[in-house]
Amino acid sequence: MRFTKDHEWVALDGDVATIGITAHAAEQLGDVVFVEVPEVGRQVKAGDAFAVVESVKAASDVYAPVTGEVVEANEALSGAPETVNAEPEAGGWFAKVRVADPAELDGLMDKAAYDAFVANS
């Protein structure tokens, strides 16, 4: 699993990346009440907002950490947004993206680097 400075996580399986927000991000947001996931077939670019998460505290964009095509969206989140709080780095994933350039993941942090980033923020 790799992590971004915007608190997204990426798990790569072959050429498909599963993307969600980190446990730290979910904790900071508080109780998630709404999630908008991207449409399947949508082309996304690394750094672009591609999903929205709203909590009792705030609304936040979720940024695509990689460039590619959305091949699956976690539609279950629309009926159960609290899954993002309960399982942020598992069942609370937002989308799966077929990665155009796997080298983009090289610039992301591993768990130890992300934990240090959060601790120093």
Curated annotation (Swiss-Prot):
The modification N6-lipoyllysine is found at residue 57. Belongs to the GcvH family. Binds 1 lipoyl cofactor covalently. The glycine cleavage system is composed of four proteins: P, T, L and H. The keyword Membrane does not apply. Residues 16-98 form the Lipoyl-binding domain. HAMAP family: GcvH (MF_00272). It comes from the Bacteria. This is Glycine cleavage system H protein. PANTHER family: GLYCINE CLEAVAGE SYSTEM H PROTEIN (PTHR11715), GLYCINE CLEAVAGE SYSTEM H PROTEIN-RELATED (PTHR11715:SF3). Keywords: Lipoyl. GO terms for cellular component: cytoplasm; glycine cleavage complex. Its cofactor is (R)-lipoate. Gene3D superfamilies: 2.40.50.100. The glycine cleavage system catalyzes the degradation of glycine. The H protein shuttles the methylamine group of glycine from the P protein to the T protein. Coiled coil: none annotated. GO terms for biological process: glycine decarboxylation via glycine cleavage system. The keyword Ribonucleoprotein does not apply.
